[in-house]
Amino acid sequence: MSEEISLSAEFIDRVKASVKPHWGKLGWVTYKRTYARWLPEKGRSENWDETVKRVVEGNINLDPRLQDSPSLELKQSLTEEAERLYKLIYGLGATPSGRNLWISGTDYQRRTGDSLNNCWFVAIRPQKYGDSKIVPSYLGKQEKAVSMPFSFLFDELMKGGGVGFSVARSNISQIPRVDFAIDLQLVVDETSESYDASVKVGAVGKNELVQDADSIYYRLPDTREGWVLANALLIDLHFAQTNPDRKQKLILDLSDIRPYGAEIHGFGGTASGPMPLISMLLDVNEVLNNKAGGRLTAVDAADICNLIGKAVVAGNVRRSAELALGSNDDQDFISMKQDQEKLMHHRWASNNSVAVDSAFSGYQPIAAGIRENGEPGIVNLDLSKNYGRIVDGYQAGIDGDVEGTNPCGEISLANGEPCNLFEVFPLIAEEQGWDLQEVFALAARYAKRVTFSPYDWEISREIIQKNRRIGISMSGIQDWLLTRLGNRVVTGFKDDFDPETHEAIKVPVYDKRAIKMVDQLYKAVVKADQDYSKTLGCNESIKHTTVKPSGTVAKLAGASEGMHFHYGAYLIQRIRFQDSDPLLPALKACGYRTEADIYTENTTCVEFPIKAVGADNPNFASAGTVSIAEQFATQAFLQTYWSDNAVSCTITFQDSEGDQVESLLRQYRFITKSTSLLPYFGGSLQQAPKEPIDKETYEKRSQEITGNVEEVFSQLNSDVKDLELVDQTDCEGGACPIK
């Protein structure tokens, strides 16, 4: 018989009385609008103590030993661990991923096995559905179908996850010839609330339905699975292997899909109506019909994935994260975003990267693209497959199933595998009296329990049980090292030569104290995983550590994001709110400057003055002042001594540094597993999200703020259910989902 661990009200009251959450300037506001779930019985959204209780209980009860009449000793031990986790997270010395903050401990988590993982990877090639929650009725479970990876991507995006996908030549070449062009008819009942809007985007009334012997009719249920299955059927009808009857007309009936604005239970939010799905299905069919008698290219497959992502964004999930990974010599793929019409229509939906190995040398066209628009990014699959931390040396096939990454690039992943993240703010945790080795051990155990979720897809269950991959990240890295060391980790550069090309290079010199600090913490994570894996009788995690880009979660604690340098020593951070957002009156009452958003109607832009941790330190550097060379070197430091997965980093560069991109990509080809770059804009845009300011302006603007937003909001009692978020970003490069 299974039993559940719960935290007592008395314990929580003691923590609230003794621990003060380390809210950043944007922290509580970011939390309230992003992670606080609605409590219908109380007519308000959660408070922070309630969120942390839900999250910790949702996680601790994943320990599989609780499923079989646990002993009192075990229950006591896990309760004590839950209490330590609660205290740690409540104080913001560490947090699980934003996905866990939103979903852990909910009914949606219990129903949906995939719900706790942020991001996934899938290879775009014919695959079997297997013993999964979604299997088209016309397929056997072991039958390979072209639709399967697109179904996986569509399903995970609608659950709020991000998906990396590979359209590398080795995958696309496995897709058979497109045998048929399909006549697609989308129908909606004339009595549907969505009828007029649906007809405008290409549907027809049900009275116009003409069915014959050559047609297939499918009435979509009003479910996520229904959307996925409709797209799967459309794709598979184009291929003789999955259309043996050679049917060439498909009628999809969307009459049952709930109208725009209707409530969505589970993940939350409101429905979009059938219109985004109608547009998507027509567009996907056009891509496939255009290749009838021929083969799909990497660009075609990426287009289908982007069209799916676009539909998901227009639907309930307001941000859809995709990373398209292509072959490094596929010029059509590399240049696909140069088609401005298609870029504006759907190709914006993914960040694009190319797969390389350490022998690759063709960086010139890649560097040119990066200077132009920040793409493509680089993913070194050879390093990912054969190395953990670089300092630990070559380990042939240590992660041999790797084929790609999640959208932010910090976790190398096999087909169907998710990332599984937990984030520690080492400076904050130390300031709150924590032993960092205990903190990182708690983090490892938290992430390990997530691997025992009942996953919906067979490919995911199998690879998770094999790899048990976790990704323990640290954030506020620049804050921590600058405060503890008094300087940045890169203390200088020395002259050297590339061992293969013999080019002159500048090799970074690292502070040896920093090497020791991160090495000890890495070993603490590995030891905790080894011990817990032995206790649970499961495989040790194939890899353990990472640096996630962070963003929304880092804002909670007011820390620098992942390994990134603060955007400026002093900033105006602009956050956009719907005009109806209940936080706006509280923000205005506290003196924050607001103005109408110039880009979006019914939206207000709120300005928050921010001072970076360590801004007054003479060795402080911001993204606007740190060199491109030091950023590459810092990423290499973390890949060498901390992360056995990868290090997510968006390196920013000034116009004057653009000519260094190619040589630095080449210099670090034996160290960097993934990287991306963007030109530094410095707040030159109107109402820029981040605008560097000077100290005097910061102090003046700070004096205008006279109240505590949390207290004023509570006094106004103006909470609202299911408010749509606008303008949320969860990482430096914009690749992560909102939650």
Swiss-Prot record:
Name of protein: Adenosylcobalamin-dependent ribonucleoside-triphosphate reductase
Keyword entries, A-Z: Allosteric enzyme, Cobalamin, Cobalt, Disulfide bond, DNA replication, Oxidoreductase, Redox-active center
Highest taxon of the lineage: Bacteria
Reaction(s) catalysed (UniProt annotation): a 2'-deoxyribonucleoside 5'-triphosphate + [thioredoxin]-disulfide + H2O = a ribonucleoside 5'-triphosphate + [thioredoxin]-dithiol
Region (Adenosylcobalamin-binding-1): 565-626
Chain spans, region Effector region-2: 168-313
Family: Belongs to the class II ribonucleoside-triphosphate reductase family.
Species of origin: Lactobacillus leichmannii
Region of interest (Effector region-1), ranges: 147-158
InterPro entries listed in its UniProt record: RdRp_reductase_class-2, RNR-II_ins_dom, RNR_alpha_hel, RTP_Rdtase_AdoCbl-dep
Disulfide bonds: 119-419
Activity control, per UniProt: Allosterically regulated by ATP and dNTP.
